[in-house]
Amino acid sequence: MHNTSKIKTWVLITGASSGFGEEFARQYAKQGHALVLVARRLDRLQALAATLRQQHSVEVIVEQVDLSDVAAIVRLQERLRERGIAIDILINNAGHGLQGPFADAPLDAVLSMVQLDVASLTAITHVFAQDMRKRRRGKILLVASLLAYQGVENFAVYSAAKAYVLRLGEALHRELKQDGITVTALCPGMSDTGFAKAAQMKITPELRMLMMEPAPVVRAGIRALNAHHMSVVPGLANKLMAIFIWATPRWLHQAAVSRVMKAQ
């Protein structure tokens, strides 16, 4: 159903060229929202924008931005402000991971992941939260991970980064609530988004059984954001895993999760 409000609602989606970001764009376009799609791959963004305009008759703006550059995030905000665009919903989805022993990974690759998954996510949240606070309304969804609930062998930096995202979301949920802003952390498990290939992951049979399609994950995130929830874990199997992590000693759930994540 399209958004029939006379006031145009703008949704900014980072990492919109694939995976969860692309699916968020499709679902929000179907609802009739105007979109700002942000990613590095301009050709993918333009193709997606053309499809969404044709299918849903919505306004779509494409912004090719390297989000690892904080100055580029500030310039993005300035360009939108100059066009009179105020972001009502921020989907902070951009990020990447890398599987493997911590000490074997090139240092520049590790720091690049920290920059995008932590520093850049913080920067874009800060920039647009300031604008939302002035208007006393807005919604922010931070894409974390089920791995945020514990340190994970061979995903040391990624799981630590996503733990930061989850804790940031929990804190901001309470902090910005008084300003009329909802902040929700989405904690998906293994999903068929292309992330595994980009992270050079080997998919175990256990992981393949747990893998979700992007659409239900995104629907769960949007529902939780609209319901003003602090966080959400999509999918029954992922919820059970989160409960298992919460209810068992650290040594036990770390051993179990490592078994699931390791390629055999």
Task: Label each region the model flagged.
Residues 93-98:
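Conserved NAD(P)H cofactor-binding loop of Rossmann-fold oxidoreductase domains
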Residues 125, 161:
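Active-site helix of classical SDR
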Residues 31-48:
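Conserved glycine-rich Rossmann-like NAD(P)H-binding loop of the short-chain dehydrogenase/reductase
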Residues 101-102, 106-114:
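Substrate-binding pocket helix/loop in short-chain dehydrogenase/reductase
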Residues 185, 205-242:
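C-terminal helical subdomain
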Residues 145:
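Residue(s) in the substrate-gating loop at a strand-loop-helix junction
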Residues 15-18:
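Conserved glycine-rich cofactor-binding loop
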